[in-house]
């Protein structure tokens, strides 16, 4: 059987966000209902270990997995990097497909390439991907810098800023674990831990199945509003689309997070990063930093 090459692939990084993943999966079936199911695939890039979440690396590993799966075609496939808590509110809001030389930015901040954006696999590889920052912050800022450095066009003709009603954004906790080194490294353009610095990578790709317990509950009352809502949701659940989980079982980067110093910051009240505030041993242990 011939391998069907998708036109675009969603790469959705996450760790410990099962509810958001379920919401994303079900709602995207509605959003993508008018698309040919062979045109796109969704990959949830899942960091399974207890180390701080490395959002840049999970995105990079999503790319590596696609390069390995489609070695002859990945450069021309559109990659849609999409946060797990962010998705369009309405069908056909975005035309995801792009071409070499153009990056489409759909949602986020103008000063960073985060939220939702599209880039070809070839352009992403040329930019050396995201920095593999352990903890939270600045990988999206660095990605925009790299795109501009390589003289790629950033197309914001379909762009919606943060808090736009055209995009659903399920906010997570504002508490962030941030490396003391990242703000200084960003200012000095000194992010050297990138796509080409991921080692000892081990991952598996599994089919993703969205379940809905209400569908099989014999106690459901068909005249009950809650039951009817659950059944409506289940109609979406039964729609088939190509969804997979990249379970990242092991990887190393140039920077070892066990050797980093982190601090915890509430980014709702203090939006500017505040380095040189040190984490205590209790918090480090809680974040999996005590090896």
Task: Tell where the protein language model's regions lie, with residue ranges.
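A recurrent flexible, glycine/aromatic-enriched loop bordering the glycosyltransferase active site
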Residues: 103-119, 126, 135
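Active-site-proximal specificity loops/subdomain of glycosyltransferases
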Residues: 22, 34-76
């Amino acid at each position: 059987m011939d391998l069907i090459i998708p036109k675009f692939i969603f790469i959705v990084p996450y760790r410990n966000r099962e509810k958001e993943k379920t919401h994303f999966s079900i709602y995207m079936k509605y959003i993508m209902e008018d698309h040919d199911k062979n045109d796109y695939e969704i990959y949830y890039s899942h960091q399974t270990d207890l180390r701080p979440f490395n959002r840049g690396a999970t995105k990079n590993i999503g790319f590596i997995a696609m390069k390995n799966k489609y070695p002859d075609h990945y450069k021309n496939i559109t990659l849609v990097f999409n946060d797990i808590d962010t998705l369009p509110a309405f069908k056909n809001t975005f035309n995801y497909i792009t071409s070499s030389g153009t990056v489409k930015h759909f949602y986020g901040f103008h000063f960073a390439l985060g939220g939702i954006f599209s880039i070809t696999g070839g352009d992403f590889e040329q930019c050396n991907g995201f920095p593999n920052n352990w903890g939270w912050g600045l990988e999206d800022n660095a990605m925009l810098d790299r795109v501009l450095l390589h003289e790629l066009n950033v197309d914001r003709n379909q762009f919606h800023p943060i808090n736009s009603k055209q995009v659903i954004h399920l906010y997570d906790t504002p508490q962030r674990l941030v490396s003391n080194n990242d703000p200084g490294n960003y200012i000095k353009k000194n992010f050297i831990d990138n796509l080409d610095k991921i080692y000892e990578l081990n991952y598996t790709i599994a089919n993703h199945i969205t379940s809905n317990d209400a569908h099989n509950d014999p106690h459901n009352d068909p005249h009950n509003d809650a039951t009817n809502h659950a059944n409506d949701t289940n109609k979406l659940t039964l729609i088939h689309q190509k969804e997979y989980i990249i379970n990242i079982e092991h990887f190393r980067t140039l920077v070892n997070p066990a050797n980093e110093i982190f601090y915890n910051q509430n980014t709702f009240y203090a939006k500017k990063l505040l380095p040189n505030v040190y984490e205590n041993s209790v918090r480090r242990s809680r974040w999996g930093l005590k090896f």
